[in-house]
UniProtKB/Swiss-Prot annotation:
GO terms for molecular function: protein domain specific binding; RNA binding. It holds the Pfam family RRM_1. It is found in: Nucleus. Plays a role in constitutive splicing and can modulate the selection of alternative splice sites. Represses the splicing of MAPT/Tau exon 10. It comes from Rattus norvegicus. Interacts with KHDRBS3. Interacts with HABP4. Interacts with NOL3/ARC/NOP30. Interacts with NSEP1/YB-1/YB1. Interacts with SAFB/SAFB1. Interacts with SRSF6/SFRS6. Interacts with TRA2B/SFRS10. Interacts with C1QBP. May also interact with DUSP11/PIR1. Keywords: Isopeptide bond, mRNA processing, mRNA splicing, Nucleus, Phosphoprotein, Repeat, Repressor, RNA-binding, Ubl conjugation. This is Serine/arginine-rich splicing factor 9.
Length: 221
């Protein structure tokens, strides 16, 4: 039995509502659906006879709840299309401002790194999951040419990412892997710039630094 006293909670406590679930859904199924977005603190499944099941999932980090909404709202699960949202209307009392349903969260920072060499199936959620090894990521975005951008809450986390996550193995949610490059945005002076691949264009921080090499389990290598 869950200890949640109020099912109406909000974005500040890391809780999300999951509706339109299949009738045979289990808590383990919900864990499998949402574990990639962050550490789950609690799952409460409401499966009452004659009613469409729904659930509440609480993440330890409220920002992971935001990611889960963007990643799973409208997701086709079996014969059902999931409805994933905060238990009440977004109130603006902390957390990320809401962007479009399929876009990244819009909280921004000046502690920014660029990433190249992402595999075609790499999403902004995958990029955030990989780069959060260096610290708290407040924004992540991915372009179609294998480029990405990540912003950290703290300067020291950004600097750690430049030192430790450059030339590391990245894996997408579809299993594609590649070795990515991580470097500072042009014009910054964080002491970690690299020149191995030549200069980047003045106007486009997403200009490629060379052809990425990636492996897909679904196509010949």
């Amino acid at each position: 039995m869950s200890g949640w006293a109020d099912e109406r909670g909000g974005e500040g406590d890391g809780r999300i509502y999951v509706g339109n679930l299949p009738t045979d859904v289990r808590e383990k199924d919900l864990e499998d659906l949402f574990y990639k977005y962050g550490r789950i603190r609690e799952i409460e499944l409401k499966n009452r006879h004659g009613l469409v099941p729904f659930a509440f999932v609480r993440f330890e980090d409220p920002r992971d709840a935001e990611d889960a909404i963007y990643g799973r709202n409208g997701y086709d699960y079996g014969q059902c299309r999931l409805r994933v949202e905060f238990p009440r209307a977004y109130g603006g009392r902390g957390g990320w401002p809401r962007a479009s349903r399929n876009g990244p969260p819009t909280r921004r920072s000046d502690f920014r790194v660029l990433v190249s060499g992402l595999p075609p199936s790499g999403s902004w959620q995958d990029l955030k999951d990989h780069m959060r090894e260096a610290g708290d990521v407040c924004y992540a975005d991915v372009q179609k040419d294998g480029m990405g951008m990540v912003e950290y809450l703290r300067k020291e986390d950004m600097e750690y990412a430049l030192r430790k996550l450059d030339d590391t193995k990245f894996r997408s949610h579809e299993g594609e892997t590649s070795y990515i490059r991580v470097y500072p945005e042009r014009g910054t002076s964080y002491g970690c710039s690299r020149s191995r691949s030549g200069s980047r264009g003045r106007d486009s921080p997403y200009q490629s630094r060379g052809s990425p090499h990636y492996f897909s389990p679904f196509r010949p290598y």
